[in-house]
Each structure stands twice: as C-alpha cells, then as structure tokens.
Amino acid sequence: MFWLSVVLCAVAVRGNPTPATMPESYDTIIIGMGAAGCTAASTLSKAGKRVLGLEAMDRVGGRVNTVPFGDGVVELGAEWIHGQFPSRVYDLAIQNNVSILPQDLDFDVYRSDGSSGDKQLLNELMTFSLGVVDDPPQVPEPLGEYITKRLMDYIKTNHPTLLQDKDFIDNLLEFLDLVIDNYESSNSWNDVSTETRYTELDGHQHMSWHRNGYKTLFQILLNTYKNGPGYPTLDIKLKKEVSQISWPQDPNADVVVSCTDGTTYRAKNVIVTVSLGVLKERYNTLFRPQLPQQKVTSIQKLSIGVVGKVILEFEKAWWDKTKWFPFIWKSDDKKRLSDDEEWVTNFSGVSPPMGNSKSLTLWSCGEVAKLVETLPEDVVKRKVMELVRRFMGKGKTIPEPIAMLRSSWFSNPYTRGSYTYDNILTPQYPNARATLAEPLLDSSGAPRVLFAGEATDNTHFSTVHGATDTGFREASRLLPTAKL
C-alpha cells in the first residue's frame, strides 16, 4: 500500500451499509475507479443508469495519484496527457476551461564524474534511436537488439571515431536501455518487441495538468469539479476490496459481487477495470465460474511493468527549471560501487515536475523500481542524494532535501504494476489485448462481465486516454444507442 495516500476528489457515498444477507441491486457495478472505471461510471450515470463503483483503495484515480507536496502538487503515477487529437482526456480539460500546458524541456547531460556530457551528440544519437522504433524490422525481434544494430550502423557512418571509445558506447547503450524502459515500464529493452500496434495521438506528447493536478480529470468525470453535485444515480464505495464475481448463465439471474468485508452487491452486469497485475495475481479466485482459457492465456502472456518515482523537495530550486538532466555513468565509477549500491545506476536522470517549483523527480523502472519500494526511507533518501551530488554537484553545494515521496505501484496489492507494454511474445499472441477485452456472455448472448482498462486497448495501452477510451467502450456496449 502507499505510505502516503490521499483522496483525489470528494465523492459522495450514498446509502447506508447493507447487511451481507441483503445484497443491494444496481444496473451495473464497476470494479476499480481509475480512469477506465470513472469514465464508464460517468457515461452510464449520464444515461440514468444506477451504478455502483467499488474501489479497494481509499481514493479514486487508480494509477493516477496527485499528491499535495511543497508549494504545489506532484504526480506519483501518470504524469502527462500523451497527445491531444483525438483525446478524450485533453478534450475534457479544454471543455472545462482547465489549463493544460506542454512540458517542453531542454536538457543538460551529466556524467558520473561530475563532468558535462556532449549534449548535441547525445541528442542526435537519442533522437535516432527513438526514431528507429517507428521503422521496425519485417521479422520481429527484441527492441534493444534492433536499436543497438541500427545505432551502431549509424555511428559507423556518421561518427566512426566513437567506435574506438568502448566505454562511451557501452554506457550510451545502458542509458538508452533505461530511456526505453522508462517509456515502456519494462525491466530491459530486450523484453520489449519491435512489433507493436501502439499509435501516438497527434499533438504534443507531454501535456501537463501542472498545478491543477491529474486529479482534476476525475473531478470532471464524476461531476464534482468546482463543487459539482456528482451524479444522483452513482454510488462510490471506497475501501471495498472485491473477493469474488459470480456471473450467471441464466439471463434472469444477477451478477453477484462479494467483498472481503462480507458485503455483497447485485447487478445486471459488471465492468472489471482492475490492472493486468491484479488479474495475473487473482484471476483464479476472482471469477466464478472461472475465466475461459483463451482469456487466461491473454492474462498470462501480456506484460505489465513498473515505473518508479522518487520525488525530492528542497527549500528552493538550485537547478534550471526548464531542463531535465540525464545521467550517464562511466564504467570505472560503476565498478567502484558495492553490490548493494548497484541499484542507483538504474535511475536515468532527474526532471522537474510542473506542479511544483521546488522539487525534482528521479525515475527508475523494472526490478530496481520494485526494490526501491521496499528499501528503508532513510536509505533511499541518502543514496539518491549521493547520486544527485555525484552527477550534478561539481562546483556547487547541493542542500539536503526537506521532504521525499516515492511511488509504490508494484507493492500496492491493488495495482501490482504501472502499465502494460508489448513484450517479445506479442507476435505469437497478437490478439491478446482484444481477447482480454471480450465480455463474458450469458446463455442469451447478453454481456454480464465486461473488461476495461489500459491493458485492453490495442493501440493506446499504457496511457490514461487509452484507459478512458476503454471505459467508454464498455459503457457503450451496455447502451446500444451510444456512439462509439
């Protein structure tokens, strides 16, 4: 669980607790009130449906978590709106006159001996490396291997003398691995396939809610923005962990949802929006009868990774707020680290969040992000400050931070990861996401258990706009007159 958790927005919880022997009945129950769940709840409530949202955490938002920090807010989860056109998330902000700003950051490169790296060269090589992702090979292969081959050919043609500097090449490739992993949430860029259906939206890819916070999206979705009244037919119950979903074949029977606190609820249908990480852990016990084998296979073969953040607050900013700062190690400096310090080499750099003027975010991913969640707070703080001073402290005195936050997306039992990516099994299971999205039907062909969430979107998985699209998709499946 989060060691710091906040309620993202005020949600009216209507009705009195119901004894387990007398289940409450709704049109639709939504399990998980993240971006997909809140979008589905909003869509159905606007249509007059009686909806119950069950959320295991003590807040709505799911893998979006806006936290008050210092002189503003920071995002422990999703940071940006990725693209503008067409984006349900961006449109909602604009329609409600919420300021959304592009985060255009220049950068300065730092090496582990405190020297400055060649910014122009790194920009050229990084731009090329990220660009070849859009030019995949005919036969799919691990993304890291493909980028490495293409980059080496590029360097051989355009910067042949660099090939003599093995230390630079090795550490450049390790840095690019971290950059890809932070995009994908993977542990290694060789866990990612060159074959993907992911499609970027048009427009700026890093639009920030800045001081408004991503929490504003959920206030808009639930009609509580600017003290809105909410929806009269929507109930949201927090701290409600679902233990079992019993779905019938009989068209006249209800779906029954049981919670760990003994309460039970009934509905015509259920929309399940929990993360792939939760499905992986609980699919055997959560559904009765159990899921069909093809859906189980999709859950097993898809991958969810972890992106971790450590956010430091200082008395005042001592860095250029218009830049992010990549860290590239030198091999000799790495060799001097002890085995229990090696995890610090997994941070790709630091960047300033837009919702706060005195904070820096350090980014990690994969197994190291999982490890950082479990280490004592004082150890994390001490080691990341040693890292920051090693790279950025040459010729200056960097003060101690006055506060620290860190994410815990893997250790949180209600998320078990950050977001999904297309792994190297993707070519063998190209329809895994579509299969995961298929509803479970009763004997009449009516959908009884529906599935939403970023993992179920073929082209916009891993994003908030992808998650919201799936929530709208499944709500629309229950509203035949809706326009998809």
Question: Which residues does each predicted region cover?
Answer:
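FAD-dinucleotide binding site
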Residues: 3-484
